Amino acid sequence: MKRTIIMMLDSFGIGEAHDAHAFGDVGSNTFGNIAKACAEGKANDGREGPLKLPNLARLGLGHASKESTGEFPAGFGDDVEIIGAYGHADELSSGKDTPSGHWEMAGVPVLYEWGYFGDKQNSFPKELTDKILARAGLSGFLGNCHSSGTIILEELGEEHMRTGKPIFYTSADSVFQIACHEESFGLEKLYELCIIAREELADYNIGRVIARPFVGTGPSDFARTGNRRDYAVEPPAPTVLDKLKAAGGEVVSVGKIADIYAHCGITKKVKATGLEELFDATLEQVKQAGDNTIVFTNFVDFDSHFGHRRDVAGYARSLEYFDSRLPEILALLDEDDFLLLTADHGCDPTWPGSDHTRERVPVLAYGAGLEPGSLGLRNSFADMGQSIASYHKLEPMEYGESFVRS
């Protein structure tokens, strides 16, 4: 029985990419800088001491990081029994965004430039926003700037509730984000507005429109909910998910995976939010999974709650929680199963600003007949997609080199 379980630790980079200089990210290292802060006692909120990830270390995380950066992260070393194959991967895609990282690891790198809204203020063309407002029957909007999602709620959430005007904002990524209150504005109305925006953005080459619903009564208790939706453009070519589906296999999306791939190549969608719920749902889907199945989970909290918010202790705390539950996954695997843990980009919580960082990502592989040891530097995330194709005996992807024997 052949089953692939992909656990995407969203934003968990392991050191600057070869082209980090082009992004202003030289020195970024999500894993390494978190470990350093923990070792120095600078991440003791809700946890304390050095970063403890014994199960990820056994899968080769520390060793992959050493190969990426030249040194072990603080608290990690050679004194561990390695049970998995480990490597580190550079990104071929032009951007350091979520769709690019996900599509590339599924065999389809993004070799063109996304469109971006580069101006920090007055970010959106008036022609665009006028069309969106006219179609939605709205009198105006708030925001029109680059911002963190939490900060913009503090600044504009009350005015939004008072006026009914949606909040439009963006970031360094190729995104158009819309924040609205679930009750005063309405969740379905927000989704409808996002669909309109997605259609009007067709000529701007923007990767995603993101619905950012929130609840609360004021800045002190405004909170984004788990009802986020991403409206992505479709990948430019069939991914390994599409190929497995076309071959009669099953592809199970847990969390926001389906949205990231614009629902292409997905046969089943499982909604889950929060680290615990996502892990629980992954376990349940692995238990149910039959032959020729991919179970694919994005653990978004690492990125959205801790990376972008530059919360080092929160990121460390969640990594330790994730690590503590890994044995539950390992216990469900058959000899022929293929477990793959990776990331889509970096988001170093010690880095200036609030944007992603251009980093290498871990490639931690277990099962599928792989011997424990180094996979070395992978020149593209697409090596993972090629390996999945090889494992499931699908026709080869155009990009990537497999590290799994078919």
Swiss-Prot record:
- Cite a GO CC annotation: cytosol
Catalytic reaction(s) noted? 2-deoxy-alpha-D-ribose 1-phosphate = 2-deoxy-D-ribose 5-phosphate; alpha-D-ribose 1-phosphate = D-ribose 5-phosphate
Q: Which UniProt keywords apply?
A: Cytoplasm, Isomerase, Manganese, Metal-binding
Please name the GO terms of the biological process aspect recorded for this protein, alphabetically: 2-deoxyribose 1-phosphate catabolic process; 5-phosphoribose 1-diphosphate biosynthetic process; metabolic compound salvage; nucleotide metabolic process
- Enzyme class, first EC level, given as a word: isomerase
Q: What does the entry comment about cofactor binding? A: Binds 2 manganese ions.
Which cofactors does it use?
Mn(2+)
- Pathway annotation from the record: Carbohydrate degradation; 2-deoxy-D-ribose 1-phosphate degradation; D-glyceraldehyde 3-phosphate and acetaldehyde from 2-deoxy-alpha-D-ribose 1-phosphate: step 1/2
- Per the database entry, which stretches of residues form a coiled coil? none
Q: Which residues bind Mn(2+) 1?
A: 10, 344-345
| Binding residues annotated for Mn(2+) 2, in chain numbering | 303, 308, 356
Q: Which InterPro entries match?
A: Alkaline_phosphatase_core_sf, DeoB, Metalloenzyme, Phosphopentomutase_DeoB_cap_sf
PANTHER family in alphabetical order: PHOSPHOPENTOMUTASE
Report the function annotation for this chain. Isomerase that catalyzes the conversion of deoxy-ribose 1-phosphate (dRib-1-P) and ribose 1-phosphate (Rib-1-P) to deoxy-ribose 5-phosphate (dRib-5-P) and ribose 5-phosphate (Rib-5-P), respectively.
Q: Can you name this protein?
A: Phosphopentomutase
| Gene name, Swiss-Prot/TrEMBL | deoB
